[in-house]
């Protein structure tokens, strides 16, 4: 089973990825949790390039770096894990590219769709959980976690996090459009709910999916 989590930075994806991993492992399943970009030595180096605040990267360059990282992760890690009947949980997948580089940066959506297909080797998650949060709430959450004064730009944030509120508003709007186009795959969850409430909604959907595919 291939499961992905989506949402703007600060929505709580990483927390829910680990909660779901533990839940599935407790039920005797082999589970691999991965993040994008990253997950292989090359992909982790690409991650550093993408997030370093001092790097001035063009939108197309950013797109292709994300795609290169994904291609490495899919072919070296995800596909072998799925072939061994492991569950794979992803903290971001190709929907992030559509939302961030497409709606956020304004790149052509048809071009992105083709690059996504190539980089992902046409893999599509069985289910995607989109944790919905406004950029304002996400920013407040991030600075609260770091015990820092609220600011729209900060050296405490990485290059992507420092893209600004208008950028993240476009990204969020993009996620909603993607969700509307893929209602059978994408489940939208209010990220302002407590972590335990979000987890309950997620495992309810996962249990239903496992029953359906058993």
Curated annotation (Swiss-Prot):
HAMAP family xrefs: Thymidylate_kinase (MF_00165)
User: Mind listing the GO molecular function terms for this protein?
Assistant: ATP binding; dTMP kinase activity
> Which GO cellular component term is one of those annotated?
cytosol
- What Pfam families does the record tag this protein with? Thymidylate_kin (PF02223)
Q: Which GO terms describe its biological process?
A: dTDP biosynthetic process; dTTP biosynthetic process; dUDP biosynthetic process
Q: Which reaction does it catalyse?
A: dTMP + ATP = dTDP + ADP
Which Gene3D superfamilies does the record match to this protein?
P-loop containing nucleotide triphosphate hydrolases
The UniProt keyword set, sorted, is: ATP-binding, Kinase, Nucleotide biosynthesis, Nucleotide-binding, Transferase
**According to the entry, what is the taxonomic lineage of the organism?**
Bacteria, Pseudomonadati, Chlorobiota, Chlorobiia, Chlorobiales
What this chain does, per the entry, is described as: Phosphorylation of dTMP to form dTDP in both de novo and salvage pathways of dTTP synthesis.
Annotated residues that bind ATP are located at 7-14
Recorded protein name is Thymidylate kinase
Cross-referenced NCBIfam families, in alphabetical order?
DTMP_kinase
Enzyme Commission identifier(s): 2.7.4.9
Q: What is the similarity comment for this entry?
A: Belongs to the thymidylate kinase family.
């Amino acid at each position: 089973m291939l499961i992905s989590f989506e949402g703007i930075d600060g929505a709580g994806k990483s927390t829910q990825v680990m909660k779901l991993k533990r839940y599935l492992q407790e039920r005797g399943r082999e589970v691999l949790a991965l993040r994008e970009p990253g997950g292989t030595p090359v992909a982790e180096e690409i991650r550093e390039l993408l997030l370093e605040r001092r790097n001035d990267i063009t939108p197309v360059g950013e797109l292709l770096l994300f795609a290169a990282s994904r291609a490495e992760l899919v072919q070296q890690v995800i596909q072998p894990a799925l072939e061994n009947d492991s569950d794979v949980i992803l903290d971001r997948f190709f929907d992030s590219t559509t939302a961030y580089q497409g709606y956020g940066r304004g790149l052509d959506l048809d071009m992105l769709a083709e690059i996504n297909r190539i980089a992902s080797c046409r893999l599509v998650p069985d289910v995607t959980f989109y944790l919905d949060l406004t950029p304002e709430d996400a920013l407040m959450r991030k600075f609260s976690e770091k015990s820092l004064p609220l600011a729209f730009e900060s050296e405490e944030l990485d290059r992507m996090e420092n893209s600004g509120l208008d950028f993240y508003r476009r990204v969020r709007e993009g996620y909603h459009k993607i969700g509307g186009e893929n209602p059978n795959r994408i489940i939208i969850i209010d990220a302002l709910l407590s972590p335990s409430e979000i987890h309950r909604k997620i495992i309810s959907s996962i249990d239903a999916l496992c029953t359906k595919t058993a």
